[in-house]
């Protein structure tokens, strides 16, 4: 599998959100608990906030409009200001002799603070943060734009991420090759989707 460009997700693909999540999202969890309408769902919400866009969670658990607005206002301000360690195998990503792009969905301040804390700024040709609270863009839109602007053939592009319903689905809809990064083997294999748990495996594939 020879590629000229690889597009990476950020959360749970380059680092573990679970390593910082309890601290980062503590104000959000407190807000939801104080609201009192999601007590029976809190454990699930705590887990899902670490790996899914908040807007989807609020919709799935039927947050009130007021709670959703308060939560989004809070999340728009949240930043993480302590050091963040990327996955240990991320060092192998830095060495890849291809064009690398970072495409992440989330609140701008929060995602930028993660990037800054890991020092990723110079590792990628471009970094794209898609903030659903201010933009209707999708990862599919960004992938397509990168391919168009840089004149890549689709077969020269690979997308790597942890979310089957986000970057993996978007890439498949564009006809791009994908690799599903499942660091801790949380999920069962899916037919037709190549899965890895380490970037050492990526080197073997490339």
Where are these regions (language model features)?
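Asp-based, Mg2+/Mn2+-dependent phosphohydrolase catalytic module
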Residues: 1-4, 101, 112-206
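N-terminal helical cap/lid subdomain that shapes the substrate entry/recognition surface
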Residues: 2-89, 94
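Conserved residues at beta->alpha junctions
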Residues: 12, 102-106, 162
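Conserved Rossmann-like nucleotide-cofactor binding loop
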Residues: 13, 108, 186
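Glycine-centered loop/turn motif at secondary-structure junctions
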Residues: 33-36, 62, 97, 119, ...
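Short beta->alpha linker loops
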Residues: 49, 88, 106-107, 163, ...
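Substrate-recognition element of Asp-dependent hydrolases with the DxDx(T/V) motif
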Residues: 68-72, 78-82, 90-118, 126-133
């Amino acid at each position: 599998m020879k590629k000229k460009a690889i597009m990476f997700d950020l959360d749970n693909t380059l680092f573990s959100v679970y390593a910082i999540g309890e601290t980062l999202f503590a104000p959000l969890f407190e807000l939801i608990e104080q609201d009192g309408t999601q007590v029976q769902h809190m454990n699930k919400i705590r887990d899902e906030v670490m790996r899914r866009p908040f807007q989807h969670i609020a919709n799935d658990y039927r947050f009130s409009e007021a709670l959703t607005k308060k939560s989004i206002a809070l999340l728009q301000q949240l930043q993480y200001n302590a050091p963040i360690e990327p996955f240990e195998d991320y060092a192998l990503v830095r060495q890849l002799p291809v064009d690398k792009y970072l495409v992440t969905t989330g609140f701008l301040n929060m995602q930028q603070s993660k990037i800054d804390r890991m020092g990723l700024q110079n590792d990628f040709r471009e970094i794209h943060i898609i903030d659903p609270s201010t933009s209707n863009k999708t990862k599919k839109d960004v992938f397509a734009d990168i391919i168009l602007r840089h004149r890549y053939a689709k077969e020269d592009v690979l997308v790597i991420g942890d979310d089957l319903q986000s970057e993996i689905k978007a890439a498949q809809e564009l006809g791009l090759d994908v690799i599903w990064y499942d660091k801790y083997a949380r999920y069962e294999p899916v037919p037709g989707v190549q899965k890895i748990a380490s970037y050492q495996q990526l080197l073997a594939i490339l």
